[in-house]
Swiss-Prot record:
EC number, as in UniProt: 3.1.-.-
Cross-referenced InterPro entries: 5-3_exonuclease_C_sf, GEN_chromo, HhH2, PIN-like_dom_sf, XPG-I_dom, XPG/Rad2, XPG_DNA_repair_N
Keyword DNA damage in annotation: yes
Record CDD domains: PIN_GEN1
UniProt-recorded name of the protein: Flap endonuclease GEN homolog 1
Annotated residues for binding of Mg(2+) 1: D30, E75, E134, E136
Binding site for Mg(2+) 2: D155, D157, D208
GO molecular function per UniProt: 5'-flap endonuclease activity; crossover junction DNA endonuclease activity; four-way junction DNA binding; magnesium ion binding; protein homodimerization activity
Tissue expression remark: Expressed in bone marrow and testis and to a lesser extent in thymus, spleen, brain and colon.
Region annotation Chromodomain: where it falls in the sequence: 389-463
Biased composition (Basic residues): 465-476
Length: 908
């Protein structure tokens, strides 16, 4: 128990110490303290056999792994002064005994418990010492003599016995394992209390040998008494009280004078304001002081001494009235040393076999569990011995270092050990020969340097192999450097195709196609180079000006791609255009070939026909223009040879393949229309197309292509072939006349080619209004491009506005006029070759048409549904630019330009 209220008095000097801070220190442990703490834990009572033994073992194991050396102190015979206290404690723990016995100081039951603890300490090799009397007295002796660095006890009597450092409130909490530390040096410096003062407090306040102390004297009065003596020995003062029991008579106090309320010195504030203060050494006014300031005047000094004497007289009166005061026996118990060292403190190696037997008998632990728990103490003891150079044959030998570990911020190593002698393994795993423990890295390296050297060598070799494997490992995700990309691009060339139109029978594409949509999509893309309505004149002009068509094709493709990007980046662009371009599936098209026989089927597009045609024309035509250049270079070595073109004319090949089809292969709509258009031929369901006239063959092709969800004619928006077959001759003549007046055709056609087909040249994709009679088309065997536009029903002709029908009616013309028009076109081409200025101007206008293509598409996307009237332009100054920048459709602009040319010719 110690001195009453001692720990409250020493509270200002308490220090919170982590258990790791005790590493390397030797601590004397009061064994009885740990036993009493284990017996008071209610959770262990009834669940754990011998809780004091279990508590003792795990505390030893925990502190030993922290490199804390322990020396246990065994209780001796208590002094007779403690008999009363011991009897009261026994009654409190075990209840009253029924018989009246003389007071004894024996601890028979407690000593039996302590003997069990000593047996365990023998098994673990822990040193212990026997105290002559109290255990804390022996701990203090060991600490004062330098055998240990501190005392681990909760009794404050250790300071009275001469201890220098005391640790109390030992806690193994995982969150904060700590102890409270008190040192005699801090107590003396901060509180002014030495060993004599602490013994005097034990007499006044009470202790184990004097439980009540001096009645009526408490902690506050005792501390005030110590302040009165100002460093004088309290024990000597006790002796003076006994020698002079008479109380000191207080001196007569002088008369109190007036004191200043500012400086607390004699005199009034007004006097100090006028004449100043002598004690403050000021001429006027005075210096203020705090509340605790004591005035040095005679009256205050006399009053203070009188007050202190009253406190001392009060305690002296109570102490002298107490029988046996000043209790010299108690003072001698604390001051006189009875303990001595009988043998040196030594640590022994834990005995594995003895510990197994002890735990099985006392604690009922299985042998394998006891061996597992004792292994850490065995390994640590052997490492410490080897560190100091004491090597024996029975020490544990490590097999290998498994891996490095960290425990409580300390670098450790996981070690695999050989199985020691008498080590028992669990029955379920008899083949386990190696054991694993975690040891401090520095200690293991000092004990087994060879094993650490081998481990480090293995680590370096493993690291070297990893570095070599990393160097030799190919980098799969390595990106090419900029120089490699530039070199690879420099080796790339745009090679022309060897054949523009391989001699393949398009009949296969139509016959093998399971549905008419696929058959329509399988037409050769190279035909589009002849029927591109926008770019044919421009391509021809640029081909004549630039000698290398491949270089020009590359430049033109870049310009068109830039135009497409800028067009797609406009905020007003509809999401329908994006979906239409996505449906094209351009990545699956074999652009190098001449047949789209393997092109996948394209889903029907449910968006607006005009919007789809605009997006398709802007996205596909530039690629087809480049293909036209490549096909032109591959098929003709000399410019202007029309023979090869006629031989590889895809329209004739397509007609030759379609002629083998039967009428029942066509949709019902076309069959009804053919029968109604040619009643004189008496067309049957199984009749072939060979018997039909050439005009009907072309219309059949146009109708079959327009009914598909992805037909060729919808790629050239404004060319609606399934409605304009009746105006074919008039249209062809007008187109040929317009082309002859404005542009030069890239190829020359023979009469035979003119009879079978007519080309559309110079018509914009989205600029022609949806007129069933005047809309531009080819009436004869015309092959159209792939498209994802919606199909156009033939019934739209009946739904067309009546004003359009009456406004754009024109008489039909014969084929002779078509021949004359083509001859006129050849002449105009020859004239333009001689006049490069005109061609360059036309080329410039052609390039400008690319820039205004988006505006034309946005402005005339709905012309097929809401026709508009256009204002013709007859000014001569605007002939060159107005025809290209004018928002009118290209057909109207060509017509106006043709009229202006004729009017100018007549005027001249």
């Amino acid at each position: 128990m110690g001195v009453n209220d001692l720990w409250q008095i020493l509270e200002p000097v308490k220090q919170h110490i982590h258990l790791q801070d005790l590493s390397g220190k030797t601590i004397a442990v009061d064994l009885s303290l740990w036993v009493c703490e284990a017996q008071t834990v209610k959770k262990m009572i009834g669940t754990v056999k011998k809780p004091h033994l279990r508590n003792l073992f795990f505390r030893i194991s925990y502190l030993t792994q922290m490199n804390v050396k322990l020396v246990f102190v065994m209780e001796g015979e208590p002094p007779m002064l403690k008999a009363d206290v011991i009897s009261k404690r026994t009654q409190t723990r075990y209840g009253p005994s029924g018989k009246s016995r003389s007071q004894k100081t024996g601890r028979s039951h407690f000593k039996s418990v302590l003997r069990e603890c000593l047996e365990m300490l023998e098994c673990l090799g822990m040193p212990w010492v026997q105290a002559a009397g109290e255990a804390e007295a022996m701990c203090a002796y060991l600490n004062a003599s330098g055998h240990v660095d501190g005392c681990l006890t909760n009794d404050g009597d250790a300071f009275l016995y001469g201890a220098q450092t005391v640790y109390r409130n030992f806690t193994m909490n995982t969150k904060d394992p700590h102890v409270d530390c008190y040192t005699i040096s801090s107590i003396k410096s901060k509180l002014g209390l030495d060993r004599d003062a602490l013994v005097g407090l034990a007499v006044l306040l009470g202790c184990d040998y004097l439980p009540k102390g001096v009645p009526g004297v408490g902690k506050e009065q005792a501390l005030k008494l110590l302040q009165i003596f100002k460093g004088q020995s309290l024990l000597q003062r006790f002796n003076q009280w006994i020698e002079d029991p008479c109380y000191s008579v207080p001196q007569s106090a002088p008369k109190k004078v007036v004191h200043c309320s500012v400086c607390s010195h004699p005199g009034s504030p007004k006097d100090h304001e006028r004449n100043g203060c002598i004690l403050c050494k000021s001429d006027k006014y005075c210096e203020p002081h705090d509340y605790d300031y004591l005035c040095p005047c005679e009256w205050h000094q006399t009053d203070h001494n009188r007050h202190l004497s009253e406190i001392e007289n009060n305690i002296k009166k109570k102490a002298c009235s107490c029988e046996g005061f000043p209790f010299h026996e108690v003072i001698q118990e604390f001051l006189l040393n009875k303990n001595k060292m009988l043998k040196p403190i030594t640590y022994q190696r834990p005995d594995l076999l003895l510990f197994q037997r002890f735990t099985v008998q006392k604690m009922e632990w299985p042998s394998h569990y006891a061996c597992e728990k004792l292994l850490v103490l065995l390994t640590r003891y052997d490492m410490i011995e080897r560190k100091h150079g004491r090597k024996t044959s029975n020490q544990l030998q490590p097999i290998r270092i498994v891996k490095p570990r960290v425990r409580n911020g300390v670098h450790c190593l996981e070690i695999e050990w050989e199985k020691p002698e008498h080590y028992v393994v669990e029955d379920g795993d008899p083949g386990k020969l190696s054991l694993l423990t975690m040891e401090e890295a520095s200690l293991f390296e000092a004990a087994y340097p060879d094993a650490v050297a081998v481990y480090q060598k293995q680590l370096s070799e493993t690291k070297g192999r990893k570095q070599k494997s990393m160097k030799n490992k190919p980098k799969g995700s390595h990106l090419p450097e900029a120089d490699d990309v530039i070199n690879s691009q420099s080796l790339m060339t745009l090679k022309p195709t060897s054949k523009a139109f391989p001699k393949q029978n398009p009949k296969i594409n139509l016959e093998n196609s399971p549905d008419p949509i696929l058959a329509q999509e399988s037409t050769s893309p190279s035909l589009n180079s002849f029927v591109s309505p926008e770019n044919a004149p421009c391509l021809n002009l640029q081909e004549q000006l630039v000698p290398s068509p491949r270089t020009l094709a590359i430049k033109q493709s870049k310009d068109v791609s830039h135009f497409l990007v800028s067009e797609c980046s406009q905020p007003s662009s509809s999401s329908h255009d994006i979906s239409v371009i996505t449906d094209l599936q351009l990545s699956t098209i074999d652009w190098a070939g001449t047949s789209f026989s393997n092109s996948p089927a394209v889903q029907r597009n449910t968006f607006s026909q005009d919007l789809a045609s605009e997006s398709e024309s802007s996205a596909i035509l530039p690629d087809f223009e480049q293909l036209s250049y490549e096909s032109e270079q591959g098929t003709s070595d000399s410019e202007g040879s029309g023979r090869d073109l006629q031989q590889s004319n895809p329209e004739e090949q397509l007609l030759s393949g379609i002629s083998a089809l039967h009428l029942h292969d066509l949709p019902l709509k076309e069959r009804i229309r053919i029968k109604s258009s040619c009643p004189q031929y008496n067309v049957g369901a199984d009749a072939g197309l060979e018997s039909l006239p050439l005009k009907l063959k072309g219309s059949c092709i146009a109708y079959s292509s327009s009914d598909g969800s992805s037909n060729f004619s919808k790629d050239l928006t404004g060319v609606y072939l399934h409605k304009e077959s009746r105006n074919s001759k008039v249209l062809d003549s007008r187109l040929q006349e317009n082309c002859g007046a404005n542009t030069s055709l890239p190829y020359s056609f023979s009469d035979k080619a003119v009879k079978t087909s007519s080309l559309q040249v110079g018509l914009p994709t989205a600029a022609i209004p949806h007129n069933p009679r005047v809309a531009v088309k080819t009436t004869k065997n015309l092959v159209m491009k792939n498209s994802v536009c919606l199909e156009r029903d033939s019934s739209d002709e009946d739904n067309a506005p009546g004003s359009w029908k009456s406004k754009y009616t024109a008489p039909e013309m014969k084929h002779s006029s078509q021949k004359h028009s083509l001859v006129h076109v050849r002449d105009s081409t020859h004239n333009k070759l001689r006049n490069p200025k005109v061609e360059s101007k036309e080329t410039k206008l052609c390039n400008e048409s690319f820039k205004t293509a988006e505006d034309e598409e946005n402005g005339f996307s709905d012309l097929g549904r809401s026709p508009q009237s256009f204002r013709p332009c007859h000014d001569k100054d605007e002939n060159s630019t107005a025809s290209w920048e004018n928002p009118l459709p290209l057909r109207q602009r060509l017509k106006l330009r043709f009229q202006n040319t004729q009017s100018g010719f007549y005027n001249t």
